[in-house]
């Protein structure tokens, strides 16, 4: 998941008094927060899921050890949260500045066959693609709204590249066919893309899960 800097400017209340900015959330709390969001959406804990679906004992054991594929892993926030609960994670990231990544490669080079060979079929896929060209602050530099389709057509080379990447990720998801998948992005332009239509979407805010920031996020 992309990291966002907290606004360094203190908050000015309506009475004119200056209050300090909210404290930064620790990495451990961030990991727990992301797992809580993920769990809420797909009705975790897994033991409850298993009971509700009336599966056999072998499947129960399999679901107690989920295989998670984390794309655009970065600091591995969601991966660490799953690992802390005993699940198996395979992370993919192109930037070698990030540590403890299973596969360093351009996502465009990654194939379903490669994932299956090296990791197996994932139960869950979590993808956090670049949000730059969809963010409210920068979208006018990268995209223009198509009046006929409503799509935010790319006008910059980087936006065109990002669209190819995102559609490649959707292809990977279709080929790997996980039980659950998540495409995480700050609430912005991605939800308006034609290739995102028909995909279930939840908008969550960090303050719903105990953080001081709102930070609306589409998953």
PLM regions and their residue ranges:
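Conserved active-site and SAM-binding loop architecture
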Residues: 2-3, 7, 12-17, 26-219
